[in-house]
Amino acid sequence: MELRIYDKSGNLRAEVCPDDNSTQQKAVMGDNALSVSFTTWEAIPFDIGDYVDYEGERYTLLTVPCPNQASTLEYEYAPRFQGIESELSKALCFLLTDGDMDSDFSLTDGPAAHLRLIVDNINRVKGTTDWRIGSVIAADYKVVTYDGIDCLTALNRIAETFETEWWIVGTTLY
């Protein structure tokens, strides 16, 4: 299998062949990462924001990997590309109304409205309108307090409040 790595502008940075030590870790309401091990003949100038698209999801470098120079001609890499979940832990959750951005608020509504809040924040952070809500449980209105928390914490708080789970497939939040 060949894996294409792009810079944050979408330009091809490298094409690599991951070895058998490469893994994907993905859990409902948990970690989502792609650890890729490979050897190249040239050093690769990785940068934060480089990404790979794998099985319909985008995985992004949040730290720059350091190569191990195995010989004068070989470089061994083991970068860890993170799913959107890790990016959400770095993004403050805002109530986005009338151009205002409030990070300390409470919302009384059903699960769909709370998920809409998260999707709006993901689209804000990613600079897109690609993210959407998938199927949502039916439930009565409940109060969720967003007291200066990040989007990942907010998602977990919503799930706890409505006694359910969340997960992401592609650019859809369920």
Role assignments for model-derived ranges:
Residues 1-47, 79-88, 94-107:
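Juxtamembrane "anchor/assembly" segments of surface/extracellular structural proteins
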Residues 1-9, 39-67, 97-124, 156:
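Short, acidic/charged, Gly/Pro-enriched secondary-structure junctions
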Residues 14, 21-27, 51-52, 69-70, ...:
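Short, exposed beta-strand/loop patches in secreted or surface proteins that constitute
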Residues 28-30, 71-73, 149:
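Solvent-exposed loop and beta-edge segments used for protein-protein assembly and interaction
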Residues 76, 82-174:
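Charged- and aromatic-enriched interaction segments used to assemble
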